[in-house]
Amino acid sequence: MVRQYKIHTNLDGTDDKVLDVTNGKVRLYQPSNLGLQSTNNIWQSNGIGVMGKRSITQPQIEFKLETFGESLEENYQLMKDFVNDILSKKFVTLEYQTEIFQVYADLALADVTKTEGYGKNGTFSEKITFDIITKWYTYENLTFDKIENGKVIAGMSKVYGGTELGGYKYIEGTSYTYYGETNIERLSRWDIKDEIFSFMGILYPQLPKTPAGVRFLDDTGNEYTAIVFKTEQAQDYILINTDVNDEVYQGWNGTTSLNLFPVMDFERYRTRIIEKGQMELINLSKAEFKIKRKADFV
């Protein structure tokens, strides 16, 4: 598989426009630098050194840009539309895919050359340079459903160890439900194995006038941050995006949106960086997430 490049104008949004810059009529190739730069703070005396903090920076990426229109007029339009699509957004996202990985980088346009179209069809051959906002990260889609109590079935609930208990008897080969958890939400937890630096989520609240959201626990089970909203009316769903460059906390009832930032429980929202541990749903029937995990070098 030849490496593939695509540009997303709004990766987290429903209006995302995907530009295929590998196989489309505007193509990017020969990137100048997909790596990184590391600055090491080292103190030395008489050849003996002490290693301090390392700082990683991401250099600009420069691509060669080529248009493949059928005519001079089409090539002008391709060039114009491509640049305007990028300029119309605060930043865009580069998708970089090979046979062994698929990663993303958030970029801001820094420079693009503009010469004259050449050849029979008026093709443009230019250079385009991007400043790096965040590079690289993985992007995953996850869905979580709340665990609920089972329905009571006469003679077939709360079976323990295959023995009769309280009038209920275990029968081999029969399916049983379990019922009676007064704090069923404590079972709606999921392990987080790797750090998440930002995520976009759609949350589906259950009860009105009851805090709704998600909380995050460390390895010892202690809450270190939570995104929880206190609303009078239950929302159809809550849209959140913790990316510092594209932050959103928005409730939706039908086609009406509401800014939920003022009703967030700020005492519990301590950090946007999600660590290894667990996540728990609070007053939610379901949650859908698009999560981003950092990968400095690929």
Swiss-Prot record:
Q: Record's InterPro entries?
A: Dit_C, Dit_N
Q: Which Pfam families match?
A: Dit_C, Dit_N
The record's subcellular location field reads:
Virion
Q: Which GO terms describe its cellular component?
A: virus tail
User: Gene3D superfamilies this protein is in?
Assistant: 2.40.30.210, 2.60.120.880
**Keyword set, alphabetical order:** Viral genome ejection through host cell envelope, Viral long flexible tail ejection system, Viral penetration into host cytoplasm, Viral tail protein, Virion, Virus entry into host cell
Q: Which GO terms describe its biological process?
A: symbiont genome ejection through host cell envelope, long flexible tail mechanism
Q: What is its main location?
A: virion
Subunit info here reads: Homohexamer. Interacts with the receptor binding protein.
What does the function comment of this entry state?
Answer: Forms the distal part of the tail. Self-associates as two rings organized back to back, with a central channel allowing DNA ejection.
Family to which the UniProt record says this protein belongs: Belongs to the skunalikevirus distal tail protein family.
Annotated protein name in UniProt: Distal tail protein
Q: Which organism is it from?
A: Lactococcus phage SK1 (Lactococcus lactis bacteriophage SK1)
